[in-house]
Each structure stands twice: as C-alpha cells, then as structure tokens.
C-alpha cells in the first residue's frame, strides 16, 4: 500500500485534473489477433492506439476465461480472494473423467467486494458500462451510473444483429435502431452519446465488447477479404475488424471533442482466443488453458503527453494491475482496508521508473472441458485444463496439477510454446518455484481440491 501511495503523491503533483478513462475489453481475442502482431488482421484503430501509446509485450489476463478474468480486474484481486474461478459450475466435463471433486465456484462477483467502478464513481467519475458484464445481474449495482447491454450471461446467443431475441438488456435497443444493426455499432453510438453528454466532467467508459465471443457470425461487408463465409477463420477475422471499426468511432469522437490529451485509453482482452480457429503460435493453446495462448493478451495504453507514442514495455503485467493503475491516474487513494494484489503501471507508462520485481500467479482448482471434437492443443483431449496453479517468474513458467501432483517447468525464452518440460533437468529451480507457489497459496488461503471423485473411471478401468 505504501508503494501505491507514494506513486499517487508523485504523479498528482504533476497532473492536477482527473483524466477521462476508457477501458476497452475485447472478448476472447488472442494476443496474435491484432494487426500490430499479425498482419493478416485489419485493425487500423487498435494499431493507431499502439502507434500513439505503449504496447506491453508480456501482458497477461488474470484468468483464462471470461468471468474470472473480469472479476480480477474489477476487484483488483487474484481469484482466491473472490472465488470466481470459471463460468457457471466448476464441475465441467464428464463426471467419469474428473478424478477430484472440484472447488465450488462463486458465479458472480460478491457485492460486498468494492469494485474499480465503485471507487471511480465515489471519486467523482461519471461511469458507464457497455456490453458484456458477466459478474452479476446489473452493473449499476457495482459502480456504474449507466448500463448498456450488460447482464449475467456471456454473449448474444442468437447473433449480433438487431433484433436481438430473448436477452432483455441487449434487446431493449431493438426499436431504437434499424433492423440489421450490429450491436457493436449500438454500443459505439451509446458510448459517443455518453462522451458528448459528460465531456466537461471526468468519465469512465467500460466498453466491454461481446465480440469475438461465440456465436461466430460473419460481417458481410468484411468477410470476403479474408476468404469468405465458408472459412471459419475468415468469419472470425471479420468480427475482429468489426470491433476495430467500432473502436474507431469512439476514438473519432475523442478527436472531435478535443479530449484525446485528457483521456487514458486502455485496450486489452479478457483471455485467449479459440485456438482451433485462430492460432496463437508461437504460444500454445487458447481460451481456457493456462498455457501462454490462453492468458497472453494484447495490451495497449494511450495517454498523449504522459505516455510516449510507439513505446514498448516488456515487463510482465496482468489484469489485476488495471485497478491500481486507473485510481493512481485519477489521484484516488485505495479504499481503507482494500487489498489490491496488482501494482500501478504508471511508472512504466511514464517511463519514469519501474515496478517491484514479482512473480505472477494463477489458480484454477476446477475443471474446464475441451471443446467437443476440436483439437486446440490444450491440456489433453478431455480438458482444456485440469485443477492446478501456475506462475511466471522471469523467463520461467511453472505449472502444478493437483490430480497427480505433476510439475512442469518451461523456459519461455527458449520455448514459448511450452513443449519441453524441464522439471527433471532443473530440480532446484522446480523446487524453488513450487515452494513459492505453496507460500502464495497459503497467504491467499487458496483452496485445493483433494477429495476423490467416487464416480471417476480411470483409463485403465
């Protein structure tokens, strides 16, 4: 806490006005799914943010699927503190394939946990949520003045074009826009209206796109350039471009209102992509996996005059850092007694210093089944991941799986695809990181599944 307070003093002595903050969170967008990392994608507006701001080349989601990643951002805490480990039940996959009884999942972020949006709201910000919430029934219960399209479910199951059926918080705009309007355009229009209405006061815009989550639905005017409607990747790429186009409308409004210099824009994703559709090579696997492809993210921050254009940072960072970063930029102290596991990134953004050296941790004491019939290079044919923990320290990535007590050690510099397990070759480093993991779990009281599942059927049986 002392570290954060010192940063507040130094930074607010230079910047007196609270900046506007726009947090753009893509859904299921992999690190290799943006133009500045992969020229196959057309993302000129995301690329603009990268060219006008700082790109983090070792950025991580705090979890490998939707709800827990978002819970970590808005709580500023690792998963064991809030208990959101997955989406829905923790007992995913066939019961006969699960050796352990998984830890019970907390489906929604508990209301008693003070959120990022609540702290900004109390600090004088006008706040709006647009798009995917997934942390409860109504974002206005957790710090937002306005909610556009956010509720407890993960995506518009019937498609992205109006009229939306059966999902009230999205369908409420069916009568306000022409039939066939894409909901990304609805959200962009609503964000623009909010910015215009509150340009004279600090605002926090949480633009949480449902894109690129399922259902995969081609954008007709964009899909042909990527290979047409029969190509699954082309459909995916057209959705990425549609999101980018929507982002461009928000950036254009900042230009028109003369607000660019007064606005911190952060772009990221909640977890990795569906790797059977969009390869994250050289990283292994994708959404739902704790291999790099499931948790590596594109992260860009633009703040003209405070963040150098075209800058790059290779310090490992993760989603839990957004809470302390945003309140630090706003000159708002962390609430008394509030535990923040992340660090403010302002020293990195301003290139005026660094942050304390640390390890990054993940804890997943539940099961997440593999996508049926799809080879996505994840944990095994049955599960994207099984109960376990992971950490990154420097170049090292360490995994522990609870079913068999298996330990895995990878050198990310030499082996970014996590193919060669070095645990037996480096027993001292493996023991060191295992002990570090155990200490971290003890400090956070992270639950570990130990009860055997009586319905488990091993391969031998």
Predicted regions and their residues:
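Sec-dependent N-terminal signal peptides
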Residues: 3-13
């Amino acid at each position: 806490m002392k570290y954060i307070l010192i940063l507040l003093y130094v930074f607010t002595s230079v910047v007196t006005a609270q900046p506007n903050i726009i947090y753009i969170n893509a859904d299921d967008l992999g690190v290799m799914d943006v133009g500045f990392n992969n020229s196959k994608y057309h993302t000129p507006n995301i690329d603009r943010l990268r060219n006008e701001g700082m790109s983090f080349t070792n950025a991580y989601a705090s979890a490998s699927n939707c709800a827990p990643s978002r819970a970590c951002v808005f709580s500023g805490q690792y998963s064991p503190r809030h208990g959101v480990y997955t989406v829905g039940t923790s007992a995913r996959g066939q019961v006969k394939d699960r050796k352990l009884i998984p830890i019970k999942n907390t489906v929604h972020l508990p209301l008693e946990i003070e959120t990022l949006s609540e702290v900004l709201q109390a600090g004088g910000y006008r706040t709006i949520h647009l798009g995917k919430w997934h942390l409860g029934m109504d974002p206005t219960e957790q710090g937002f003045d306005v909610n556009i399209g956010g509720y407890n479910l993960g995506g518009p199951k019937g498609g992205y074009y109006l009229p939306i059926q059966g999902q009230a918080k999205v369908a409420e705009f069916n009568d306000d826009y022409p039939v066939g309007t894409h909901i990304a355009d609805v959200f962009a229009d609503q964000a623009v209206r909010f910015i215009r209405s509150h340009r004279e006061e600090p605002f926090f815009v949480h633009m949480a796109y449902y894109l690129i989550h399922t259902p995969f639905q081609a954008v007709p005017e964009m899909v042909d350039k990527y290979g047409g409607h029969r190509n699954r990747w082309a459909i995916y790429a057209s959705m990425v471009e549609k999101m980018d186009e929507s982002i461009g409308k928000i950036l254009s409004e900042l230009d028109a209102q003369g607000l660019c210099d007064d606005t911190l824009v952060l772009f990221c994703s909640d977890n990795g992509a569906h790797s059977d559709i969009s390869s994250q090579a050289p990283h292994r696997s994708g959404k739902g996996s704790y291999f790099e492809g499931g948790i590596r993210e594109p992260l860009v921050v633009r703040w003209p005059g405070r963040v150098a254009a075209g800058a790059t940072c290779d310090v490992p960072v993760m989603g839990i850092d957004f809470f302390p970063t945003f309140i630090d930029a706003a000159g708002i102290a962390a609430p008394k007694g509030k535990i923040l596991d992340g660090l403010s990134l302002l020293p990195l953004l301003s290139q005026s210093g660094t942050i304390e050296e640390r390890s990054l941790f993940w804890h997943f004491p539940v099961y997440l089944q593999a996508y049926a019939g799809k080879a996505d290079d994840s944990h095994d044919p049955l599960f994207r991941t099984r109960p376990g923990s992971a950490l990154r320290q420097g170049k090292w990535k360490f995994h522990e799986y609870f079913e068999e007590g298996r330990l895995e050690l990878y050198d990310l510099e030499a082996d970014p695809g996590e193919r060669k397990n070095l645990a037996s070759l480096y027993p001292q480093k493996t023991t060191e990181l295992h002990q570090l993991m155990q200490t971290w779990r003890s400090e956070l009281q992270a639950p570990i599944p130990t009860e055997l599942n009586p319905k488990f059927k091993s391969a031998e049986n």
